[in-house]
Amino acid sequence: MSFLSNIFARRQQSSSVAKDRLQILLAHERGAGEAGESDLIRQLHKEIMEVIARHVAVDQDKVQIKVDRGSGCSMLEIDVEVPQELSGKRGS
C-alpha cells in the first residue's frame, strides 16, 4: 500500500523542501567548525545557483552566501543581484 501512496501522494512545494534541506544541512554542519563551514558554503552556493538558474539568468559572482553562527542559532544570509531586465527561462 505504501508504494501506491508514494505514487499518488501530494508533493511538497519546492520552497518547503528547500527550507527543510537547509535546516537539516545547517544543523548537521553546526558542530563541524571552520573546516566544515567552507564545504557547507560551497555546497549551498552550488545548489542555490542551480535553483536560481531555473528561473533567471544571474552572474554567479553576484551571489554572496554567508553563515553566521550565534548562540543557539545559525543565520544563513544570501545576497543575489538580480538584473533589472529579467531574462527568465519561464517566459513570465
UniProtKB/Swiss-Prot annotation:
Function as written in the Swiss-Prot or TrEMBL entry: Prevents the cell division inhibition by proteins MinC and MinD at internal division sites while permitting inhibition at polar sites. This ensures cell division at the proper site by restricting the formation of a division septum at the midpoint of the long axis of the cell.
Pfam families from the UniProt entry: MinE
One GO process term, biological-process aspect: regulation of division septum assembly
UniProt keyword annotation of Cell cycle present: yes
Family matches, as InterPro entries: MinE, MinE_sf
Domain of life: Bacteria
Segments traversing the membrane: none
Entry similarity comment: Belongs to the MinE family.
Name used for this protein in its record: Cell division topological specificity factor
Gene that this polypeptide is encoded by: minE
Keywords in alphabetical order: Cell cycle, Cell division
